[in-house]
């Protein structure tokens, strides 16, 4: 089960039923994932189990187009790692974190920390004992990297020098 996305106004989470192969095959865990064959159901956030004691996932952070999706695929193929490429729920958490200290914030800082711990527990689960999960975060998620990794998580950050990055962006589609 993947906690796919949140409806903050209703305090619901869309849970998608995925097999391990679905995670491996998905380029990204975004809206394109929700085809007709994927079972899904909206659930109250508080009705979902708290897996805060589950292992935290490892992370790949990146800025721009630097091969992070390829790195995620290679790690998953070379090991028994479960790849989670750009889960949408993390994007929602980053948006909440951006406004957490402002009066218009939808969550209090305490609720943000609680929901973050729940989300990390959900994303850290594997399909069998000992299987690690690795999240390839989207670029905007890098803003909450400290919140996601804590003091004991494993993470890598991918980037390219600015001149090479500019060349790549200006070159357009290959």
Where are these regions (language model features)?
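Short conserved AdoMet
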Residues: 76, 128, 150
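A broad, structural surface signal
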Residues: 69, 73, 117, 121, ...
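Short His-Asn-centered micro-motif
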Residues: 60-64, 85-86, 135-141, 158-160
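Generic beta-sheet signal
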Residues: 56-60, 128-135, 153-155
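PAPS-dependent sulfotransferase catalytic core
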Residues: 1-118
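Glycine-rich phosphate-binding loop used to anchor ATP phosphates in small-molecule kinases
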Residues: 120, 124-147
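PAPS-dependent sulfotransferase catalytic domain
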Residues: 92-108, 139-174
């Amino acid at each position: 089960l993947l906690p796919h996305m949140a409806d903050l106004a209703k305090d619901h989470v869309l849970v998608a039923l995925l097999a391990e192969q679905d995670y491996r095959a998905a380029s990204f865990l975004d809206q394109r994932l929700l085809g007709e064959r994927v079972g899904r159901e909206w659930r109250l956030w508080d009705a979902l189990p708290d897996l805060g004691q589950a292992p935290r996932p490892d992370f790949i952070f990146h800025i721009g187009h630097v091969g992070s999706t390829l790195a995620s695929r290679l790690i998953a193929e070379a090991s028994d790692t479960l790849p989670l490429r750009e889960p949408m729920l993390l994007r929602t958490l980053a948006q909440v974190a951006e406004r957490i200290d402002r009066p218009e914030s939808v969550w209090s800082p305490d609720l943000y920390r609680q929901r973050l711990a729940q989300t990390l527990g959900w994303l850290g689960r594997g399909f069998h004992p000992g299987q690690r999960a690795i999240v390839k975060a989207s670029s905007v998620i890098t803003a909450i990297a400290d919140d996601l990794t804590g003091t004991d998580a494993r993470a890598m950050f991918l980037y390219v020098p600015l001149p090479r990055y500019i060349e790549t962006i200006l070159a357009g589609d290959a």
